[in-house]
Curated annotation (Swiss-Prot):
Residues carrying sugar: 106, 163, 236, 255, 269, 339
Name this polypeptide is given: Growth/differentiation factor 9
Superkingdom to which the source organism belongs: Eukaryota
Post-translational modifications: Phosphorylated; phosphorylation is critical for GDF9 function.
Protein family: Belongs to the TGF-beta family.
Molecular function (Gene Ontology), one example: cytokine activity
Positions of the UniProt region annotated as Disordered: 305-328
Source taxonomy: Eukaryota, Metazoa, Chordata, Craniata, Vertebrata
Database matches in InterPro entries: Cystine-knot_cytokine, Growth_differentiation_fac-9_C, TGF-b_C, TGF-beta-rel, TGFb_CS
Pfam families: TGF_beta
Subcellular location: Secreted
Naturally occurring in which organism (per UniProt): Papio anubis (Olive baboon)
Any Gene Ontology CC annotation: extracellular space
Length: 455
């Protein structure tokens, strides 16, 4: 027993001697940390604190609002898209979203994602015949690796851009022959078999048209649904001028140089939780809104016998009320020890009231302007301020908020008071350049705070 007792005595002495040293080191370390944080706050802008130090700590440093956008930040230099394709997507963004990036409510489309892909490889062939207007087939390969498993294809379009220097004196009719080439390998012969599909389309374009759109949904939808991310297609164009309007035109001569290699546009529905689901909001906007408050307001006006009984009871209550008022008037108006200003303070809202505050920033401050094309500025807004003791209906707070206030004041001050937090949000439309050079239009849910509450 002597050996264990000596060991315990030695251990306690050692701990007693070391405790002040460790405490002092912790205190000095804490002072240094406070000084460093004060220096950081005084010399740095708020958004410099959002810059991740390490890629592993990015999700922990950035607030949830920017986690979605920070995924595309950094990494290898991005490929720059074609200027014509970028111009088309900018026009699409202006059609679907406001200047502040809020999706327009008058748009009833079901897709929340639009991706534009340019061909990664192209097999050039001999120029087209200027006399017959026939353009030889061109082989194109599109890489669709940016499509995620939660994105479902709704519509696909081939986009041809027209050279601005070309002017049309008459309408031009074109026929497009498209063939999808899908290589497959047999387990026995290991030879590649070529599966082809032919798609014909007739369309016209005139003086004001700068783009030609060809719907190829029926061909690409089964391929994209089967998670095929490499699309090899062969396209042939035959374009001729309208002979009825210009019979003197020699063999319908048409300048084929106005057609540049096409881009592929996919209209997708992102089913993830972070995406904005327009159909969901449209469904709830069209529903008849009659909540429990309306039901209570309807039942507050009795009819028939209930109304007569309520009238008699209100008459008795009125007489009792008069007696109460007369007795109250006989009392002194204000007691000697009563402070009128303190009495009215409980009915006033705090000066620093819970409300929305603006926080306007540009993506250039975050060094994200090299891949976020639109919007240029962003105002996420935030909620800040004190919650009143008696939370009114304008905050839309539940009864639990008032109960929590009572617990804090009367029972246990360790229970936190209700906090000022966002209650409603609006979505945000973002146009970005992907690492592979493709362009993506996406609508994100819950990106701009629009209402505050106390909870």
């Amino acid at each position: 027993m002597a050996l264990p007792n000596k060991f315990l005595l030695w251990f306690y002495c050692f701990a007693w001697l070391c405790f002040p040293v460790s405490l002092g080191s912790q205190a000095s370390g804490g002072d240094a940390q406070i000084a460093a944080s004060a220096e950081l706050e005084s010399g740095a802008t708020p958004w410099s604190l959002l810059q991740p130090i390490d890629e592993r700590d990015r999700a922990g440093l950035l607030p949830p609002l920017f986690k979605v956008l920070s995924v595309g930040r950094g990494g290898a230099p991005r490929l720059q898209p074609d200027s014509r394709a970028l111009h088309y997507m900018k026009n699409l963004y202006k059609t679907y979203a406001t200047k502040e990036g809020i999706p327009k409510s008058n748009r009833s489309h079901l897709y929340n994602t639009v991706r534009l892909f340019t061909p990664c490889t192209q097999h050039k062939q001999v120029p087209g015949d200027q006399v017959t207007g026939i353009l030889p087939s061109v082989d194109l390969l599109f890489n669709l690796d940016r499509i995620t498993t939660v994105e479902h294809l709704l519509k696909s379009v081939l986009l041809y851009t027209i050279n601005n220097s070309v002017s049309f004196s008459s309408a031009v009719k074109c026929v497009c022959n498209l063939m999808i080439k899908e290589p497959k390998f047999s387990s026995k012969t290991l030879h590649r078999a070529l599966y082809s599909f032919t798609f014909n389309s007739q369309f016209e374009f005139g003086k004001k048209h700068k783009w030609i759109e060809i719907d190829v949904t029926s061909l690409l939808q089964p391929l994209v649904a089967s998670n095929k991310r490499s699309i090899h297609m062969s396209i042939n164009f035959t374009c001729m001028k309208d002979q009825l309007e210009h019979p003197s035109a020699q063999n319908g001569l048409f300048n084929m140089t106005l057609l540049v290699p096409p881009s592929l546009i996919l209209y997708l529905n992102d089913t993830s939780a972070q995406a904005y689901h327009r159909w969901y909001s449209l469904y709830y906007k069209r529903r008849p809104s009659q909540g429990p408050d309306q039901e209570r307001s309807l039942s507050a006006y009795p009819v028939g016998e209930d109304a007569a009984e309520d009238g008699r009871s209100s008459h008795h209550r009125h007489r009792r009320g008069q007696e109460t008022v007369s007795s109250e008037l006989k009392k002194p108006l204000v007691p000697a020890s009563f402070n009128l200003s303190e009495y009215f303070k409980q009915f006033l809202f705090p000066q620093n009231e819970c409300e929305l505050h603006d926080f306007r920033l540009s993506f250039s401050q975050l060094k994200w302007d090299n891949w976020i094309v639109a919007p240029h500025r962003y105002n996420p807004r935030y909620c800040k301020g004190d919650c009143p003791r008696a939370v009114g209906h304008r905050y839309g707070s539940p009864v639990h908020t008032m109960v929590q206030n009572i617990i804090y004041e009367k029972l246990d001050s360790s229970v936190p008071r209700p906090s000022c937090v966002p209650a409603k949000y609006s979505p945000l439309s973002v146009l970005t350049i992907e690492p592979d050079g493709s362009i993506a239009y996406k609508e994100y849910e819950d990106m701009i705070a629009t209402k505050c509450t106390c909870r």
